[in-house]
């Protein structure tokens, strides 16, 4: 069934094991291994899809459509179900927690490159005017990435009368200058 002239091909069972990915991505593999989650790297980043083994014409005609690994290496499609926010105003403090709920390794994670989460907080008064702002960068190189299923807490002292906090979380992959929106939240006092 595997025909790809002019060379022989075979199926290597190691390609569907997370240990295969771990040979290069040691840090991320160690994070994943520590979670005890059984899903493999390939299940998330290379989900199976119905396609031909090779897509180059005319060799593609030699193969039937079957379940093969998606080689787009999906990543970074985070949303509010992945990173949870708990927040409250308490006196002169604004406290909040972030929780990586679904990604079974640190977010972001990298053995190479510098992916980042950017957290922007804007504080507004009753009139809707900005009275303060802050930014956090969550990155593996700074040891500030969000571990799987562990709350990370932040606390800000408020020096002005604040009615609400607008929070924006963005993700920047290691190979992009673009920051993609993960979610936006408004917390009222």
Spell out what each predicted region is.
Residues 1-160, 173-188:
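Primarily the internal scaffold of c-type cytochrome electron-transfer domains
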Residues 162-164:
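Extracellular Ig-like/FN3 beta-sandwich strand-entry sites
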């Amino acid at each position: 069934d595997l025909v790809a002239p002019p060379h022989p091909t075979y199926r290597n069972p190691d390609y569907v094991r997370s240990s295969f990915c771990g040979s290069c991505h040691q840090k991320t593999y160690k994070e994943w291994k520590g979670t005890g989650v059984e899903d493999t790297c390939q299940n998330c980043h290379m989900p199976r899809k119905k396609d031909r083994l090779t897509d180059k014409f005319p060799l593609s005609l030699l193969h039937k459509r079957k379940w093969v690994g998606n080689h787009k290496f999906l990543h970074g499609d985070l949303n509010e179900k992945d990173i949870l926010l708990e927040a409250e105003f308490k006196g002169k403090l604004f406290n909040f927690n972030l929780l990586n709920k679904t990604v079974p390794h640190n977010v972001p994670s990298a053995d190479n490159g510098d992916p980042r989460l950017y957290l922007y907080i804007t504080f507004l008064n009753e009139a809707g005017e900005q009275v303060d702002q802050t930014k956090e960068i969550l990155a593996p190189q700074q040891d500030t990435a969000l571990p799987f299923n562990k709350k990370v807490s932040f606390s800000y002292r408020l020096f002005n009368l604040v009615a609400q906090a607008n929070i924006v979380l963005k993700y920047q992959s290691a190979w992009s200058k673009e920051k993609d929106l993960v979610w936006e939240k408004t917390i009222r006092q």
